[in-house]
Amino acid sequence: ACFPKAAVREGKTADANLAASLNHMLSAPYIDANILGYGFDMVSMLVHELQVQLPMLQNYPTEEKLSSYDRYLIGCLLIQQLLKWHLVDSTYTCPYIPVYQMKFPTILEECRKRFQFILDHGYDTPEKVRFLLEHFIQINHLEDTLEVSEA
């Protein structure tokens, strides 16, 4: 799992949010993949998430006005949703794409590359997840903020 290097009690709640977003980006689709075979209605859950998250995304300013923190969180959300919708139907276009094309085109392109990297590498073992977490910490220049731990 990914953790902030400084304790939340030291006022580093933003760091904790960054770590949680990165962890959730990979863990939520992994969990969803494992419950699909048990009759779980994934599409209903994804549609509900869409109804909650799209209005929130539409309230954000365009990407040139976003803080680096918000860019990161919005990017993690899209990658997570791309992975989840890919589980349902790999040929289906994720319904988040039109909003990202309109408001966050650069973030969208970055996320598409990262999504493909995740698919190419896989995220179905602890070793693969650790590699991905370390990779995303590095490419986002968060080495001073986040670290990967076994705990």
Regions found by a protein language model. Name each.
Residues 43-151:
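Pan-zinc metallopeptidase signature
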Residues 25-47:
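Internal, conserved structured core segments that host functional sites
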